[in-house]
């Protein structure tokens, strides 16, 4: 494949291609081998992004009845746990038209059936792009596979029935490192992608996952959900507040966008629970809390410290602090000052949330640190948490 690059934050990063593109290339190559009865070393795949890829084919084998081969995933410079895995396709002749737990493509006298084998997940929850009980092969990869195999069939004048089986031997193990089990994909990974390409360090991939989780919560009947930025928040919810994490959606640094998406998915209430190191930024109106976007943590603590009575020396010491915990420790040198400051920080964070969400969705927030526990909460946070936990979870199972 000819390498493609994009520049992000002054870094030159290499594009990759999706599991869906791997499945497409492997299926096309297997179909070619079945008809030619010869090994295939490369195939050209057209992606929805308009980029043609020349991909290497591995582990080829064939008989007169079937052909099998693999294409290895290359995620480029994107930190993807599926990078390097082999995606296999087995294409075989079929004479029957029995239903399978897969997908069917018919055009004239041609019938293609796409099924999943080892390591490809099965959808177990509604709200995904695939029906419950079907293989987790999303619509765009499905169409790519069908159109590329159909092209081969037309090339050889084939009219009849073929079965296309995608399998990924490492899929079940790798899926444990992904969001798949949480989103309702069991037993393996998905064939994903809308463009056929992997954009390095793509924010869209993360926000798409957040939107999908919010959508699943909504269609399962939840009107109120918890947002939390990361692992600290999930641990605090589970260990300190005894919250089942099925009520929560991890929003990473995308607090503003997550609130927008919750509104769009008709969620009625959102409780944001997060570590002070993240959510103190929200008190300054920072809606993307990634360190590369903005900071302002010490400035926020120092400003409210001054507003609540801290002297000039203490303000300067707070500004020179490296961590939020250091800043809080300095505030604690004055009795009652930390509590006053955090009351204002929580109020401002809550106000910024409410402003972003608008009138159609209620918002509350809870700030904590691992060392100090809850630092503060907005007025309705406790009651909102009770309402969230009172919701029926059976449709999420």
What are these regions (language model features)?
Residues 133, 396-397:
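Short, surface-exposed secondary-structure junctions/capping segments
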Residues 2, 7, 14, 20, ...:
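A structural signal for small-residue-enriched, beta-sheet-centric alpha/beta enzyme cores
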Residues 362-394:
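Short, amphipathic C-terminal "tail helix"
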Residues 1-177, 181-183:
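Generic N-terminal targeting/processing segments that precede catalytic cores or assembly contacts
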Residues 62-65, 88-90, 108, 132-135, ...:
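Short, low-complexity, polar/charged sequence segments that are solvent-exposed and flexible
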């Amino acid at each position: 494949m000819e390498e493609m690059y994009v520049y992000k934050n002054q870094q030159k990063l290499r594009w990759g291609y999706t599991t869906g593109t791997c499945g497409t290339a492997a299926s096309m190559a297997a179909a070619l081998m079945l008809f030619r009865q010869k090994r295939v070393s490369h195939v050209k795949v057209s992606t929805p992004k308009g980029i043609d890829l020349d991909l290497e084919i591995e582990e080829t084998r064939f008989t007169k009845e079937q052909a099998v081969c693999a294409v290895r995933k290359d995620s480029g410079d994107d930190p993807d746990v599926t990078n390097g895995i082999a995606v296999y396709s087995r294409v075989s002749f079929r004479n029957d038209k029995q239903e399978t737990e897969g997908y069917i493509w018919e055009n004239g006298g041609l019938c293609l059936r796409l099924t999943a084998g080892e390591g490809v997940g099965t959808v177990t929850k509604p709200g995904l792009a695939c029906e419950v009980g079907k293989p987790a092969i999303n619509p765009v990869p499905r169409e790519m596979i069908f159109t590329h195999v159909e092209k081969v069939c037309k090339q050889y004048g084939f009219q009849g029935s073929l079965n296309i089986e995608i399998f990924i031997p490492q899929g079940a193990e790798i899926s444990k490192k992904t969001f798949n089990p949480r989103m309702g994909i069991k037993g393996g990974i998905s064939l994903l992608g809308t463009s056929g390409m992997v954009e390095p360090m793509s924010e869209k991939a993360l926000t798409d996952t957040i939107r999908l989780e919010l959508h699943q919560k909504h269609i399962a009947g939840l009107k109120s959900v918890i947002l939390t930025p990361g692992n600290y928040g999930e641990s605090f919810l589970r260990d300190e507040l005894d919250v089942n994490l099925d009520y929560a959606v991890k929003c990473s640094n995308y607090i503003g966008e997550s609130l927008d998406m919750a509104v769009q998915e008709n969620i009625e209430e959102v409780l944001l629970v997060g570590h002070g190191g993240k959510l103190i930024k929200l008190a300054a109106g920072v809606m993307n809390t990634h360190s590369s976007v903005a900071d302002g943590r010490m400035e926020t603590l120092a400003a409210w410290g001054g507003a609540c009575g801290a002297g000039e020396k203490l303000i300067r010491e707070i500004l020179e602090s490296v961590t939020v915990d250091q800043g809080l420790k300095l505030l604690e040198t004055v009795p009652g000052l930390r509590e006053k400051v955090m009351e204002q920080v929580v109020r401002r964070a809550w106000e910024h949330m409410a402003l972003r969400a608008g009138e159609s969705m209620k918002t509350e927030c809870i700030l904590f640190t691992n060392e100090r526990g809850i630092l503060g909460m907005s007025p309705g946070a406790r009651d909102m948490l009770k309402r969230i936990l009172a919701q029926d979870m059976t449709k999420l199972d």
